[in-house]
Each structure stands twice: as C-alpha cells, then as structure tokens.
C-alpha cells in the first residue's frame, strides 16, 4: 500500500450501517456545486451531495475503481478521511438491475399520474424516485 500520508480513507454510511470502507488514491463525488475530486491531504470541507455516482480509485494490488450509487446526503473530508453519510447507497456489484429498472418504470407511471392529478407533492416524490432509479441503473450498466 502507498504511504499513509498519500492515501485517503473513504467510508460511506447509511441508516442501515457501513456500506463502504477502503483506502483510495482519489474519490470523485457529485456535490450540489458540481463534481469534486478529492485526494489525500485535501483541505477540510463539508458539502451536500446530489443523487449520483461516487467513484473510488482504490489503493490495492489491482488499483481498480469502485462505483457506488449514492442517493444524496453529505460528505466531510478531514485528516485524510472522506466520510459520506447518505440516505441510501449501493455498490455497483450489489445493484439488482431488474429491480432498478422496475423502480424506474414505477416512478415514470407515478409521474404521469401525478401530472394528471395536478399533485405537485406526488410529482416531486416520483421525480426523486426516478432520479434514484436512473442513478442505480447508470452505475450498474456503465461498468
């Protein structure tokens, strides 16, 4: 493994517990301000996250990347630790594509129904559900 001062520890936590905990060369997240690349020795920050893919360039024998579908939350970076707290997060290898596609289809139907009913609350909830489903599909199919 690389020298610890050049390594970033990445952990992702949801209400269900720890989803991810590895050392990385680089972490890429989608914050509300745009895409952020985080490396070791980064200045301390706290930022809210968008629904999107988190890409981790791991530090190990194979130097591979891990992709995690994260549904919002926030990230804190301090002392070579990047901690992401999210409502939900799912590693690419754990995403069930057929379930994600079914969730997308349900959300699209809910959007159509909410528009027909002129129900703005249901429309917003269905749009978020659609973004989450599409995020999971994109993470699963892009690797």
Swiss-Prot record:
Signal peptide feature range: none
Subcellular location: Cell membrane
GO cellular component: plasma membrane; proton-transporting ATP synthase complex
Membership in a protein family: Belongs to the ATPase epsilon chain family.
Assembly, per entry: F-type ATPases have 2 components, CF(1) - the catalytic core - and CF(0) - the membrane proton channel. CF(1) has five subunits: alpha(3), beta(3), gamma(1), delta(1), epsilon(1). CF(0) has three main subunits: a, b and c.
Membrane topology: Peripheral membrane protein
SUPFAM superfamilies named in the record: Epsilon subunit of F1F0-ATP synthase C-terminal domain (SSF46604), Epsilon subunit of F1F0-ATP synthase N-terminal domain (SSF51344)
First-listed, main subcellular location of the protein, grouped into a coarse class: membrane
Membrane spanning stretches: none
This protein's name: ATP synthase epsilon chain
Keyword annotations from UniProtKB, A to Z: ATP synthesis, Cell membrane, CF(1), Hydrogen ion transport, Ion transport, Membrane, Transport
Disulfide bonds: none
Coiled coil, from the record: none
Record has Cell membrane as a keyword: yes
Role summary: Produces ATP from ADP in the presence of a proton gradient across the membrane.
GO molecular function: ATP binding; proton-transporting ATP synthase activity, rotational mechanism
InterPro entries: ATP_F1_dsu/esu_C_sf, ATP_synth_F1_dsu/esu, ATP_synth_F1_dsu/esu_N, ATP_synth_F1_esu_C, ATPsynth_dsu/esu_N
């Amino acid at each position: 493994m690389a020298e610890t001062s050049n390594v970033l520890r990445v952990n992702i936590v949801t209400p269900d517990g720890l989803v991810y905990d590895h050392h990385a060369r680089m972490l890429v997240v989608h914050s509300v301000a745009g895409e952020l690349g985080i490396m070791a020795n980064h200045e301390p920050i706290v930022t809210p996250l968008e629904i999107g893919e988190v890409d981790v360039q791991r530090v190990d024998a194979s130097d591979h990347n891990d992709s995690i579908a994260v549904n919002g939350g926030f990230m804190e970076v301090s002392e070579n630790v990047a901690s992401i707290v999210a409502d939900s997060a799912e590693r690419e290898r754990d995403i069930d594509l057929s379930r994600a596609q079914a969730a997308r289809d349900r959300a699209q139907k809910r959007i159509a129904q909410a528009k027909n009913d002129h129900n703005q609350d249901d429309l917003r909830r269905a749009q978020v559900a659609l973004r989450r489903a599409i995020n999971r599909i994109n993470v699963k199919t892009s690797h």
